[in-house]
């Protein structure tokens, strides 16, 4: 059985739609664990579904990382999936994950692309994760080319073995989790080559904060714990600039240009110089470069 873990904080209204979307799964061999992170309005599920639903409420606000850890420790399934309350799984996701697990008994990690919608810009794109044989600490320090928590499945035993998500961080917890996973010698990944999660992104959303204090702390933490070589340091310096640019570009702020210019100086890439100029002209136009696969 699969366990789908959903952290929720002050988004009670999103929960019914999320559960309704899971009724479309072509396999119902899963449970759902909603971890209410001490929301102002308690999450209550009164409707019954074809799959078991458990709601756990944290007594104090713990953050998304510890909420996922709580769900994992409580879960009854052998494999863990993670879903945020503003994303959804494709109808065939659970069935395909279960098939892969059955056909590949030695694996302990599954990942796949996501279909992403830029809501305000009116277009979608599909992420392009790297192949299992390409995964290395060096490669992931350069960019997270695996995906976030809604794009992975992990054997519960492996999740607990590496200690789950770090509660020392309030940003980049999923990225840190992948890097920690790569340090485990028994890590055995498998890639499904089709998008099985649908994610939505909104530019100029009030929840996208440009305060990068927690992000900078997470960057420093990751540098201290995973960067060991000159190549790793160079790769992560480049990625840190991308990470710091993200909230600014999502807020359509020209401040993102500073970070892309930093990347240009580090890489001497003409592409990054052009992106810098595009951001200075129009951050919205820079977002639309994804429409062209740039």
UniProtKB/Swiss-Prot annotation:
GO biological process: biosynthetic process
Species of provenance: Haemophilus influenzae (strain ATCC 51907 / DSM 11121 / KW20 / Rd)
Source domain of life: Bacteria
Protein name: Uncharacterized glycosyltransferase HI_1696
EC number, as in UniProt: 2.4.-.-
InterPro entries cross-referenced by the UniProt entry: Glyco_trans_2-like, Nucleotide-diphossugar_trans
Keyword Glycosyltransferase in record: yes
Record keyword Lipoprotein present: no
UniProt keyword annotations, A-Z: Glycosyltransferase, Transferase
GO MF, any single term: glycosyltransferase activity
UniProt record similarity statement: Belongs to the glycosyltransferase 2 family.
UniProt cross-references to Pfam families, sorted A to Z: Glycos_transf_2 (PF00535)
PANTHER family on file: GLYCOSYLTRANSFERASE, UDP-GLCNAC:BETAGAL BETA-1,3-N-ACETYLGLUCOSAMINYLTRANSFERASE-LIKE PROTEIN 1
Cystine pairs: none
Transmembrane residue ranges: none
Biological classification of the source: Bacteria, Pseudomonadati, Pseudomonadota, Gammaproteobacteria, Pasteurellales
């Amino acid at each position: 059985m699969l366990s789908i873990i959903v952290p929720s904080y002050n988004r009670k209204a999103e929960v019914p739609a999320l559960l309704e979307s899971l009724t479309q799964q072509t396999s119902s061999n899963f449970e759902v664990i909603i971890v209410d992170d001490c929301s102002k309005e308690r999450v209550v599920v009164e409707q019954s579904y074809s799959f078991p639903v458990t709601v756990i409420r944290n007594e104090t606000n713990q953050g998304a990382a510890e909420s996922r850890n709580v769900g994992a420790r409580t879960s009854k399934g052998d494999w863990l999936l993670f879903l945020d309350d503003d994303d959804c799984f494709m109808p065939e996701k659970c069935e395909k994950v279960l098939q892969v697990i059955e056909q590949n008994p030695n694996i302990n990690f599954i990942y796949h692309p996501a279909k992403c919608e830029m809501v305000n810009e009116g277009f979608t794109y599909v992420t392009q994760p790297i192949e299992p044989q390409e995964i290395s600490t060096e490669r992931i320090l350069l960019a997270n080319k695996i995906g976030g928590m809604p794009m992975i499945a992990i054997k519960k035993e492996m999740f607990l073995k590496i200690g789950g998500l770090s509660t020392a961080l309030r940003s980049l917890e999923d990225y840190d989790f992948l890097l920690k996973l790569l340090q485990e010698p028994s890590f055995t990944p498998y890639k499904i080559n089709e998008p099985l999660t649908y994610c939505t992104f909104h530019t100029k959303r009030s929840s996208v904060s440009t305060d990068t204090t927690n992000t900078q702390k997470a960057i420093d933490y990751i540098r201290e714990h995973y960067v060991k070589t000159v190549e790793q340091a160079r790769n992560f310096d480049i990625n840190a600039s991308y990470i710091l640019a993200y909230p600014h570009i999502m807020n359509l702020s020209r401040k993102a240009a500073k970070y892309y210019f930093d990347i240009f100086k580090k890489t001497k890439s003409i592409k990054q110089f052009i992106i810098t100029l595009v951001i200075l002209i129009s951050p919205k136009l820079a977002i639309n470069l994804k429409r062209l696969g740039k």
